[in-house]
Structures are given as structure tokens and as C-alpha cells.
Amino acid sequence: AHQWFGDLVTAESSKHHWLQEGFATYYALLAEKELYGEDYFYSYLYEKAQQLKFASRTDTIPVLNAKASSLTFYEKGAWALFVLHQKIGDKAFKKAIKNYLKKHAFQTVNTNDFFVEIEKVAAFDTKLFSKVWLEDYKFNTLEANDLLKKNAAIKVQLELDQLRNTPLAEKKDFLMKVLQSDVYYTVKESVIFQLRKESYDDIKELLVLAMATKNWSIRQKIANLFPKVPEAFKADYETMLTDASYQTQEIALFQLWNSFEN
């Protein structure tokens, strides 16, 4: 991606560094979307949105600033492009990018040069967009979530997020439904995350469902769930010693050794 954004077209100053890193990150993600699918694509964007939202509590430097962090240049820059892509549509976005690269090939550019090409293909308020996504250090969670909800898996993920502080008894049926569904595996991992402070007896039905997914990543989350492996869970836990992931095997072996004398 840097062959186009960085090599073919280069930012004129560090203030506009997102034109390289944000663009390269987003286009690499678009390529991964073609390989791994939409659920992967939206799961990545969701994860980065959480990181950016958390970082904005202490990081007050926006995208259009030479001192912005790598997370801001790369990931918020990519997020800004995703928002723009969604707002003006795929056809207009691709046309603007193509025109931008052709017009400024082997030259230095600034953010306004890019916006000029956007305004040629779409009736879009680039000034407002810039204020919200490039000049404000805060992450626009409301707008981000509205776009993320277009993906069915992330819609469920956002519902799960709302239940983080809900007592287990009140959300258990929903958690079981998620684990039994064909929703993307990262959403099921979020279910495991919400079980970390619960007793084994209260969550054993959920663990049976999670283990049955046979997804190595979900099972690895279970391997790390307990400080000590419950005696009643030992037999099921031992099946992770033969999982496809060597890291899961390592975690399981250590946890079993740490939990049982023999």
C-alpha cells in the first residue's frame, strides 16, 4: 500500500502524515477484507475503535498534527477514511482516490489536495469531516457505532458491550444464544471475557458451549479464564493439551501443573 501512499504520493509535512500511514493502513485492510471477509474487516475496525476511544482519554493530539501518535496516524487515519468511504459511496470514493493519485503522482501533497478530489465527485462537507475526524482528538463513538452496526456480528458485539455490568443471571440466556449461533468468533470471545469474574458452577453450561465451538482462539481464551483450574472442569480442560495451537497447549500445561499436585 505504501507504493501508492508514501512513495507515489508523499505528504508535504509531518502534519499530513496520515495521508501515508492512514491510507496505507486502510488499503491494507481492504485487501484483507477480500481475503478474510466482512466479519474480519468490521471486527478489526471495532477493535481499533475501542483502542482509539480509550486512548482519547489521555491523548489529546489529533490526526492533523505533526506530534500525533502512531495509533492516531495509522488507525484513526484509517478510521477517517472508512467513514468517508461509507459517506460518499464506493464508486465516488474509488474515483476520487484514482484521480488524487494520478494528479499528484511523484509529488508532495497536503490534506486539502485530497479534499479537492473528494469535492469533485461528491457533495460532501469536507470541512465538517475534517473538524470531527482530523482536527478533534476525541473519537466519535456514536458515528462509529452507527457504521459498525451495518455488520450483523458487530451489532451483536455492541449489544454484548451494553451487558458488561449486568448480573450474569439476567444475561445468561443471551450469552448462551450467542455461543450457539454462527456469529463471528471474536463476538463469542467477548462472551468469555464477561465470565472471568464468575464462579465455575455458574458458568459451566456456557463453557461447554464455548468449548464445543472447537475454535482455537475461543478455547485459548478459556484456557486463560481461571487462576486455578476447577476440579470439576479438569477433564474438559485437559482436552486443550492437544489443541492445534501450541500456545494453547503451553497455557493448559502450565495451568494444570499449577492447579493440581499430581
Task: Say what each PLM segment does.
Residues 6, 11-12:
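A donor-sugar binding/catalytic signature common to diverse glycosyltransferases
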Residues 8, 85-88, 96-100:
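Active-site and adjacent substrate-binding regions of carbohydrate-active enzymes
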